[in-house]
From Swiss-Prot:
Gene name of this polypeptide: BHLH2
Expressed in which tissues: Ubiquitous with higher levels in buds and flowers. Specifically localized in developing root hair cells. Expressed in epidermal root hair cells (trichoblasts) and moves to root hairless cells (atrichoblasts) by a cell-to-cell movement through plasmodesmata (at protein level).
Function: Transcription activator, when associated with MYB75/PAP1, MYB90/PAP2 or TT2. Involved in epidermal cell fate specification. Negatively regulates stomata formation but promotes trichome formation. Together with MYB66/WER, promotes the formation of non-hair cells in root epidermis cells in the N position. Whereas together with CPC, promotes the formation of hair cells in root epidermis cells in the H position by inhibiting non-hair cell formation. Also seems to play a role in the activation of anthocyanin biosynthesis, probably together with MYB75/PAP1. Involved in seed mucilage production.
Species the sequence originates in: Arabidopsis thaliana (Mouse-ear cress)
Protein name: Transcription factor EGL1
Subunit structure: Efficient DNA binding requires dimerization with another bHLH protein. Homodimer and heterodimer with GL3. Interacts with CPC, MYB0/GL1, MYB5, MYB23, MYB113, MYB114, MYB75/PAP1, MYB90/PAP2, TT2, TRY, TTG1 and MYB66/WER.
Entry's induction text: By UV treatment. Negatively regulated by MYB66/WER, GL3 and BHLH2 in the developing non-hair cells, and positively regulated by CPC and TRY in the developing hair cells.
Subcellular location: Nucleus
Top-level taxon in the UniProt lineage: Eukaryota
């Protein structure tokens, strides 16, 4: 983040960003400028936040415009970042620093996830050619990333932060000597009209002038600000031998014929290892490459047809050469915010350079040991060891004490098993041997024999019941015929007597004391009652009440009336503990059926 005297961005850049971001309704806008203190490095220039807000703290009047609120929120986020940085950098406690750190309008708990992303981005720096901003400046073309939260960290170094902030679309394009980055939480397909709209809004504002205190700082050419590319002429070539002992990399050179016919050597490598990396400290400023820009007469159009796939491949290849893992930087920033470390720099490569030189120290990429292998080994170790943690007790060898306990419990179990077998042997009469297999075999055979006996008894009982019912039916038919004949005779006699006898004389029914018209058969709990008597009104209900009073539960009732007789058959069962005898049932029914 550019601070102090090395600030290379104008004061009105935030307002230009605010107008552009609000117009396209994206979440934020960041301008990455080339560092004045570390050439070849992109750092935070300025930014504008336009996303969701969790807590708003302001001491201004309520009628402040929304535009001013957005600028105020962006400024509060910048002050919060500076206060957190100052609080860590001055642990000894300068009173001025402490007062400034405590004056921040926001605190970390007031921020949303998107604001956290915007805040942490202030601590990022990029080598030219590294990450999305560095790749956009290196290739001179915009980079549109639609899957920011799931992108590879080698391509998008802030993918972890983007995932936490639900950020989906990030766009970077070179502009005004730096890189302009815009992002949103919505998924937006690639549309160059968005980039053109942002550029147009910037051009409508006052002209952009770069303010820098370094006299030896050269302006970086923006290839998208003009219709054609302007080649960079190398007026002083590298020495054929390097005092640092590093191998000299070959370069591609083309010849260019000027209007005056002069031939010069030009290089189309806008960004390469010569810019993003460093030459050894022994080289002074006179050994460095001096670059100049030509005018309109010296322009030559380069081939603009570059594949986006190749560009992303170059970004990934360059990101593989980074000396530090992205997660280390993320952890460093978070630990700084929570006051557990004093580091806010991306890595040691930005601390080991010569402050008197304009270049950082160059390191061969092959000698850099990346942390990717270590991370892969750690992931594999976790995947293999975590599932085995639940089976730790099974894998650990038993101690002598545990072995003794197991043996004792096994001995007790065997003793109980032997006792059960001996009990079983005493119950089964046909067991002749005492071994366990013989006991089990004899037990199985004995149980099968018992099952056969039960089946035989059940079949015998069913046959006996069937025979009893058949016998009762046979006895029932002749009795019915005799009783009907006698009843007919009695009726004829009764009719004859009715003619001779006066109406005031009672008729003789002739059924009192007859026991042949009542039969009671009992088999176990089942009782069958067969009754024939003279019919009168309500006699059936009286008979059923008597049966119920004798603790008999009626299951089926068959009744018929004819010629003044009631024929009744009741199948019932005894209920309860008090069982009525056949004599009691017969006496009770006779009192009801043959009332004179």
């Amino acid at each position: 983040m550019a601070t102090g005297e090395n600030r290379t961005v104008p004061d009105n850049l935030k307002k230009q960003l605010a107008v552009s971001v609000r117009n396209i309704q994206w979440s934020y806008g960041i301008f990455w400028s080339v560092s004045a203190s570390q050439p070849g490095v992109l750092e935070w220039g300025d930014g504008y936040y336009n996303g969701d807000i969790k807590t708003r703290k302001t001491i201004q009047a309520a009628e402040v415009k929304i535009d001013q609120l957005g600028l105020e929120r962006s400024e509060q986020l910048r002050e919060l970042y500076e206060s957190l940085s100052l609080a860590e950098s001055s642990a000894s406690g300068s009173s001025q620093v402490t007062r400034r750190a405590s004056a921040a309008a926001l605190s970390p708990e007031d921020l949303t996830d998107t604001e956290w992303y915007y805040l942490v981005c202030m601590s990022f720096v990029f080598n030219i050619g590294e990450g999305i901003p560095g790749g956009a400046l290196s290739n001179g073309e915009p980079i549109w990333l639609c899957n920011a939260e799931t992108a590879d960290s080698k391509v998008f170094t802030r993918s972890l932060l983007a995932k936490s902030a639900s950020l989906q679309t990030v766009v970077c394009f070179p502009f005004l000597g730096g890189v302009l980055e815009i992002g949103t939480t919505e998924h937006i397909k690639e549309d160059m009209n968005v980039i053109q709209s942002v550029k147009t809004l910037f051009l409508e504002a006052p002209p952009y002038t770069t303010i820098s205190t370094r006299s030896d700082y050269q302006e970086i050419f923006d290839p998208l600000s003009d219709d054609k590319y302007t080649p960079v002429f190398i007026t002083e070539a590298f020495p054929t031998t390097s005092t640092s002992g590093f191998e000299q990399e070959p370069e591609d050179h083309d010849s260019f014929i000027n209007d005056g016919g002069a031939s010069q050597v030009q290089s189309w490598q806008f960004v390469g290892e010569e810019i993003s990396n460093c030459i050894h400290q022994s080289l002074n400023s006179s050994d460095c490459v001096s670059q100049t820009f030509v005018g309109t007469t010296g322009r030559l159009a380069c081939d603009p047809r570059k594949s986006r796939i190749q560009r992303l491949g170059q970004i990934q290849e360059q990101s593989n050469h980074v000396n530090m893992d992205d997660d280390v930087h993320y952890q460093g920033v978070i630990s700084t915010i929570f006051k557990t470390t004093h580091q806010l720099i991306l890595g040691p490569q930005f601390q080991n350079f010569d402050k008197r030189s304009s270049f950082t120290r160059w390191k061969r990429s092959s000698s850099v040991k990346t942390l990717g292998e270590k991370s892969q080994k750690m992931i594999k170790k976790i995947l293999f060891e975590v599932p085995l943690m639940n089976k730790k007790e099974e894998l650990l060898p038993d101690t002598p004490e545990e072995t003794g306990n197991h043996a004792l419990s096994e001995k007790k179990r065997r003793e109980k098993l032997n006792e059960r077998f001996m009990t079983l042997r005493s119950i089964i009469p046909s067991i002749s041997k005492i071994d366990k297999v013989s006991i089990l075999d004899d037990t199985i055979e004995y149980l099968q024999d018992l099952q056969k006996r039960v089946q035989e008894l059940e079949s015998c009982r069913e046959s006996a019941d069937t025979e009893t019912r058949i016998t009762m039916m046979k006895r029932k038919k002749p009795d019915d015929e005799e009783e009907r004949a006698s009843a007919n005779c009695m009726n004829s006699k009764r009719k004859g007597s009715d003619v001779n006898v006066g109406e005031d004389e009672p008729a003789d029914i002739g059924y009192a004391g007859l026991t042949d018209n009542l039969r009671i058969s009992s088999l176990g709990n089942e009782v069958v009652i067969e009754l024939r008597c003279a019919w009168r009104e309500g006699i059936l209900l009286e008979i059923m009440d008597v049966i119920s009073d004798l603790n008999l539960d009626s299951h089926s009732v068959q009744s018929s009336t004819g010629d003044g007789l009631l024929c009744l058959t009741v199948n019932c069962k005894h209920k309860g503990t008090k069982i009525a005898t056949t004599g009691m049932i017969q006496e009770a029914l006779q009192r009801v059926a043959w009332i004179c």
